[in-house]
Amino acid sequence: VGFKAGVKDYKLTYYTPSYETKDTDILAAFRVTPQPGVPPEEAGAAVAAESSTGTWTTVWTDGLTSLDRYKGRCYHIEPVAGEETQFIAYVAYPLDLFEEGSVTNMFTSIVGNVFGFKALRALRLEDLRIPTAYVKTFQGPPHGIQVERDKLNKYGRPLLGCTIKPKLGLSAKNYGRAVYECLPGGLDFTKDDENVNSQPFMRWRDRFLFCAEAIFKSQAETGEIKGHYLNATAGTCEEMMKRAVFARELGVPIVMHDYLTGGFTANTTLAHYCRDNGLLLHIHRAMHAVIDRQKKHGMHFRVLAKALRMSGGDHIHAGTVVGKLEGEREITLGFVDLLRDDFIEKDRSRGLFFTQDWVSLPGVLPVASGGIHVWHMPALTEIFGDDSVLQFGGGTLGHPWGNAPGAVANRVALEACVQARNEGRDLAREGNDIIREASKWSPELAAACEVWKEIKFEFEAMDTL
């Protein structure tokens, strides 16, 4: 057949409602808002084309390959309830389109170019189904939940953390002092904030040294294993690795990375190093809201969470749920399960568009952090369960008596909630009573309860189904 130049509708090639998806296909669910006058089939096909083999006109080199083998296909379109102009377009991509073990390449293909497409008003990637054949090309988290518990020798409860504040401006020695005040009080971890890298007021090497001293002193005093998330994020991969190597030489248990600002290539590199060298890896999601906050455009956090599990990280920040609306709770628990479990069933009520099988890729601990304090402890324990990290920054350092009593208050509250749950009490209903009872035995907790008794952060949820 001779080459026929010209422009033809995408849907003639890329909209294939009769296509039966394969177990090896990567499946994507896009929320598409077409421009007025663009039919949904054409918009869905355009997304499939521009994120796989297509371009705006017919090219003669199409004849040199088998497009049927390599093209993305829009195989199903459904309306979005309550939204006249939005549709969910399901696209299947053949596995051959993607480099093995590269989240970078996967995202460059699926979300690389198509989001600036003129025929679309807005486009949001709601979910991805990663086939087991592709999952198996990734190392995933350096260690995973069970190995981390064994390393730390901590079982049967959530882990407790605290972000050191003020996040910027402390000298290395004062920073280390704050770490030392928190850890002996009962916290498992303290944390660098996401933007603590190596600034003029505190260079990274000084911070690492003082924090390591605080960790080892706390361990000697308490008999518990302690850690501080040393942020290795840097301007170059080489510098990042230099910091991770120094952390390993100090003998500390965990380092940290900002995976979105640092990038997936850097993150996967660091995750491989951490597995080879016995370091845990804490992941902060700085910049995520730029990508995931708009309901119509961008990418849902559940996709970023799946990508992180593939790229590698042992902890990741996942929101708090507390004080927010019910729908948001279900959505958050949906991606928390995606992080922790081996096999997650499709469940649209929780925002899960596909069934995901991780074939024993290690799990990631979700981290609840941001605006939480002792009164939230029962709800957090109930919502997140044991396999989580609860992080109280201001909720530790803001204690009226100082950092160490703040740490004690959080640990007492947590142990009280875990004990009450194990005795069969209902944390959702009796939470406040449980905290009040515990505070009779702990003056530190009583003082914390008094300070934060009225604080709430309640706004309407951005993220609805």
Swiss-Prot record:
EC number(s) per entry: 4.1.1.39
Family membership noted in the UniProt record: Belongs to the RuBisCO large chain family. Type I subfamily.
Binding site for substrate: 113, 163, 167, 285, 317, 369
Subunit structure: Heterohexadecamer of 8 large chains and 8 small chains; disulfide-linked. The disulfide link is formed within the large subunit homodimers.
UniProt gene name: rbcL
The organism's taxonomic lineage, starting at the top: Eukaryota, Viridiplantae, Streptophyta, Embryophyta, Tracheophyta
Protein keywords: Calvin cycle, Carbon dioxide fixation, Chloroplast, Disulfide bond, Lyase, Magnesium, Metal-binding, Methylation, Monooxygenase, Oxidoreductase, Photorespiration, Photosynthesis, Plastid
Main location: plastid
PTM summary: The disulfide bond which can form in the large chain dimeric partners within the hexadecamer appears to be associated with oxidative stress and protein turnover.
Reactions this protein catalyses: 2 (2R)-3-phosphoglycerate + 2 H(+) = D-ribulose 1,5-bisphosphate + CO2 + H2O; D-ribulose 1,5-bisphosphate + O2 = 2-phosphoglycolate + (2R)-3-phosphoglycerate + 2 H(+)
Name of this chain's protein: Ribulose bisphosphate carboxylase large chain
Additional facts recorded: The basic functional RuBisCO is composed of a large chain homodimer in a 'head-to-tail' conformation. In form I RuBisCO this homodimer is arranged in a barrel-like tetramer with the small subunits forming a tetrameric 'cap' on each end of the 'barrel'.
